[in-house]
Amino acid sequence: MKEQKWIHEGLITESLPNGMFRIRLDNQDMILGYVSGKIRRSFIRILPGDRVKIEVSRYDSTRGRIIYRLRNKDSKD
């Protein structure tokens, strides 16, 4: 059976080397996130200040995989 994951939304607060990011979740927890392969292949840029969806394992809640970059509400796109 495939492992179940939690999906949270959060804000990128800091960009770290090797595609890692420090993310503040909506419940104020700070976790370490990395970019998923689909986002990396699609050349989607993730910068500090972006809101993202992150998938967190139930076994290690301090690390997660960024699966979606949310559109900013104040952008003109």
Swiss-Prot record:
SUPFAM superfamilies according to UniProt: Nucleic acid-binding proteins
A Gene Ontology term for the protein's cellular component: cytosol
Domain S1-like: 1-71
Lineage: superkingdom: Eukaryota
InterPro entries named in the record: NA-bd_OB-fold, RNA-binding_domain_S1_IF1, S1_domain, TIF_IF1
Gene3D superfamilies: Nucleic acid-binding proteins
PANTHER family on file: TRANSLATION INITIATION FACTOR IF-1, CHLOROPLASTIC (PTHR33370:SF1)
Similarity section: Belongs to the IF-1 family.
Subunit text: Component of the 30S ribosomal translation pre-initiation complex which assembles on the 30S ribosome in the order IF-2 and IF-3, IF-1 and N-formylmethionyl-tRNA(fMet); mRNA recruitment can occur at any time during PIC assembly.
Protein name (database record): Translation initiation factor IF-1, chloroplastic
UniProt organism field: Daucus carota
